[in-house]
Regions:
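Well-ordered beta-strand positions
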Residues: 59-61, 107, 136
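Active-site environment of divalent metal-dependent phosphoester hydrolases
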Residues: 2-6, 27-31, 48-53, 75-79, ...
């Protein structure tokens, strides 16, 4: 949601990064994010990206990990993750990432890592702290994911 100042703070703190993944609601800021990141960027459209030509979802592989990203609203994530998990399993994803709820979550279910980094703009979890996640993949291909605060 156009949280450019928070994004700038996060990128300055975490740089250099190898990839940035944005899970939707850029509200026209995709070009700015891509220019600011200085690395490959994956962005999907959120429910507030009305006239965007961004993809609804993407799949890609990082160090042997099949990653599926979506904003999540088409999978009704506000009511639970079961539809999203079913889709991720159908796509043989190792990791599924979604946004929409603005609440951070990280867990594994049926062999799929499910994560929501929360929000650096409008957090909705208890305490309403702005959050994001950093994923590092070790030499064996195992991802380590950490929740961080702006």
């Amino acid at each position: 949601h156009k949280a450019h100042v928070s994004l700038e703070q996060v990128l300055e703190r975490e740089k250099p990064i190898d990839m940035l993944i944005h899970l939707g609601d850029v509200e026209g800021g995709a070009d700015y994010i891509e220019a600011l990141a200085g690395c490959p960027v994956h962005i999907v459209a959120g429910n507030n990206d009305y006239f965007s030509d961004l993809p609804q979802e993407e799949e890609f592989v990082v160090e042997g990990n099949h990653i599926f990203i979506t904003h999540g609203h088409y999978y009704y994530v506000s009511m639970g993750e079961s539809d999203l998990l079913k889709e991720a399993k159908g796509r043989d994803a190792d990791i599924v990432m979604y946004g929409h709820t603005h609440k951070p979550s990280l867990h594994e279910e049926d062999g799929v890592t499910i994560l929501n980094p929360g929000s650096i703009s409008y957090p909705r979890q208890s305490g309403r702290q702005k959050t994001y996640m950093i994923m590092e993949i070790d030499a064996s291909g195992m991802p380590e994911i950490e929740l961080k605060y702006v």
